[in-house]
Amino acid sequence: MIRPDLSSLPAYVPGSTQPGALKLASNESSLSPLPSVSAVINDATSNLNRYPDMASGALRGKLAQWLGVDLDNVAVGNGSSALCQQLVQATCKDGDEVVYAWRSFEAYPILCKIAGAVGVGVPLKSGRHDLKAMSEAIGERTRLVFVCNPNNPTGTTVSRDEFREFMGRVPADVTVVLDEAYVEYNRDAESPVALEELQRYPNLAVCRTFSKAYGLAGLRLGYLVGPAELVEAVNKVGIPFGVNALAQAAGIASVEAQGELAERVDATVAERERVEAYLAGVAPAGADEPLTYPSQANFVWLNAGERAEALDEALKREGVIARCFAGEGVRVTVTTAEETDVLLRALERALPAVGLVEAGAESAGLQASPQAD
């Protein structure tokens, strides 16, 4: 009665929790939604006896106006991960291929398998997308390519020139998706600007989320911008009433709260830089790869390799829950100044304990943030 291929379907592993520990495993904001957005959510609860607008017309209209595109170019979904799944379903038949970097967003291979598509993972090169190798992996059955920028879990970005060179090698009948779940944290001036690239390439779409910077992970809301034909197809394979009323109201309010958002994001970026300064100041213990890569997201990647699980356990003993990728590394979310203080103290003990840095190494980055005073 059950599809036999589901027995080999890898399970998506969410960030774990532990009572009394600091959870830095899921790239969530540790703060509540933006104040003005919280007020709108509270007001919207009075109408929960009614179905939401199935077309999400007001939200899509607000997004279209904000982004400077037509309404027909915008889709919304139950988180950007749902939109990624709809993209696979809308573009791929059984046996068609989807190309993505690996390691990247771990849902990609799962979404492919669910849709009957074949995932083609192309290894990262020094923690970054190898766009040349990805273009070479495109074959006759390739229908879709995901470029996660900034990349999850390494935090690295592709440059505008690299991306345009890559797009020049992609066949016109292959859809490329810029997955920009962490775009609000990206300070890399050389990164492609999505709206500019959408005007250049008719086979390009951009996927974003309200889960991270906007602090709406619990409401599940994402949006897609792309060609009208693709948006129509994505909507056809979506679940009816897939975006709930609270999410729609919160999305509209979030677009209108860009000033509040900027303050919050700037604070997170400052904490990311503080963590990176600490990691740059310690002495790696004979590793072939750097301890971390420059991140443009709300997390940092610790290149622990075979010691990833040991580092994960060492951090747990210090009261910090991170996200372990066994045999590869550990991803740690960056949040507030107070939580960064806890993280840095934990890293100071955990990194030497597993032999990733020289014992007793000092770092100028290990100091309390002035924001925490």
From Swiss-Prot:
Keyword Zinc-finger annotated: no
Modification N6-(pyridoxal phosphate)lysine occurs at: K212
Annotated catalysed reactions: an aromatic L-alpha-amino acid + 2-oxoglutarate = an aromatic oxo-acid + L-glutamate
A Pfam family: Aminotran_1_2
EC supergroup of this enzyme: transferase
GO biological process, one term: L-histidine biosynthetic process
The enzyme's E.C. designation: 2.6.1.57
Cofactor: pyridoxal 5'-phosphate
Domain of life: Bacteria
Keywords associated with the record: Aminotransferase, Pyridoxal phosphate, Transferase
Keyword Membrane among record annotations: no
InterPro entries per record: Aminotrans_II_pyridoxalP_BS, Aminotransferase_I/II_large, ArAT, HisP_aminotrans, HistidinolP_aminotransfase, PyrdxlP-dep_Trfase, PyrdxlP-dep_Trfase_major, PyrdxlP-dep_Trfase_small
TM regions (residue ranges): none
GO molecular function, one term: pyridoxal phosphate binding
PANTHER family found in the cross-reference section: HISTIDINOL-PHOSPHATE AMINOTRANSFERASE, HISTIDINOL-PHOSPHATE AMINOTRANSFERASE 2
Family: Belongs to the class-II pyridoxal-phosphate-dependent aminotransferase family.
Binding partners and assembly: Homodimer.
Function: Aminotransferase that catalyzes the conversion of aromatic amino acids and 2-oxoglutarate into corresponding aromatic oxo acids and L-glutamate.
UniProt name for this protein: Aromatic amino acid aminotransferase
